[in-house]
Amino acid sequence: KLYATASSDLYDKWDKYMQSHKKKLDFAYNTLQEAKKSGDKDAINAAQEEYERTFKNVTLNDERYKAMINETTAKMAHVNEIALGYVNDETPKVYTLNYNAFADEKIDGYDFTLVNERAVKNLIESDKIELPPKKVDITKDQRWNAKNLNSQLMQGILQGESIPKIAKRLQTVTDMNRNSAIRNARTMVTGAENKGRQDSFKKAESDGVIMKRRWVATHDERTRAWHSDLDGVEVGLDEPWENEYGEIMYPGDPTADPANVYNCRCSIRAIVKGFA
């Protein structure tokens, strides 16, 4: 809903702004269309140049347009902050659930000590658990979105597109922004899940439990081929899995290559061998 609202706001702002220049832009656009119909190359080139000049003058070269883009990207960055805040609030819960999941192993002669979410939050805040909350780099976020908005605008101008068609182009940027947020959220949750499991395995190992870790891939068309290849592969607690993109300690490992991490939905499970 957050991103749908942001997309709608962008469209409304664009429409309101462009309506104030509609007469001259429509004239330039219609002139270009007539030139194309005529088939006269010189007329087409002249009309295209005039269309580009007119459009750029009311957008990329206009201070009011620049202010609109700045306001829009600031709001998009704020939406990203809100969305990331939701995820940051959830990751301690995700970590806790997956840490405590080791108790389900029901190993004879071994009682696993559960942790609570408040304790996990305290450990995260004191850097005793490597699960730091993510933050939005506002400047970088705004710059990225402004670049993409202006890039879509330029492509539309160079293609000689109408105002409504360019408006649809701009909406793809908010879709990209939403997809990026979903990817980051999925990656953070996967990392929290498997970091919780990894830490629970380490605790059990320190108590004398001998085990290995098994990679569990998600079996569908969205799973990376190199993660499917890792499915069922067992390694020691301090051993990484390896593939063509390097080493990875667990699904969602923030120290691994991004190609091994982003959008990953894999997990790990303990394979208990006995006691030391």
Feature names for model-found ranges:
Residues 1-175, 271-276:
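N-terminal leader/targeting and assembly helices and adjacent pre-domain segments
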Residues 175-176, 180-276:
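Acidic, glycine-rich two-metal-ion catalytic cores of nucleic acid-processing enzymes
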